[in-house]
Amino acid sequence: MDTGLALAALIGLGSALVLMYAVLRNYTYPKIEEPFFSDPTLFKIFTVGLFEGTLLFVLYTYLWQLFTVVGLGFVVAILFGAIIEFAKLVTLNLKRFSGISDTIFYGFGLGLGLGAAMAFGMIYYWLKGELDVTSTIMVVMLALQYLLLGAANGVVVGEGVARCKPMEFTLQAVLYSEAFHLINIPFYMETDVIWIKYVALIAASALAVFIFYRAIYRRLPKVVDDVLKMNGKTRNDIYGLK
């Protein structure tokens, strides 16, 4: 069995399914009687995210070497960060998703699928080469960063569509994504100063975890409540709402 493929599936797809269960179980059956979203729609849009993430990863395989070019790396990081988030907006910014609280969850599903595909491809792609244990751990860390950031920024873009302010929140997600890619530039550099790669990965991991925590556990419950009230509705079973 291809070890790289197995690890890519475990980290990319396996972690995505675990995250999906951990986050969404408080908003659907059997935890509550009236789910906050449609399960079939969520899985469809998760599949769309997998497709988009695959296309973006193909683009990544052409762009990553440019990260090492002085000056050009910053431009590529900014452009790639923007492309990822606007891809989510193009998918979510439909009339059927505008102004409804469900969209926040669909944004999560879309971003999670996109991040899972990126993580899967990244691990499989990098592990085709001969990497030592330390390098393998670094690649896995990078892949998990994409998974967390994808899901979190999906919620941010979804919030914008739900609040009928898509561009405002998408630009916020773009800033997060661009900051993440800029921080990670040293990871791609060919240098003997290996500690700079560690610092970049740790800083990017901290940023991804912070954005994920803020989006999922701080923002999501409040946004659901706000959008429901915007539509003249209210619920007292929103998980995490104080």
Say what each PLM segment does.
Residues M1-K242:
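Hydrophobic alpha-helical segments at protein termini of multi-pass membrane proteins
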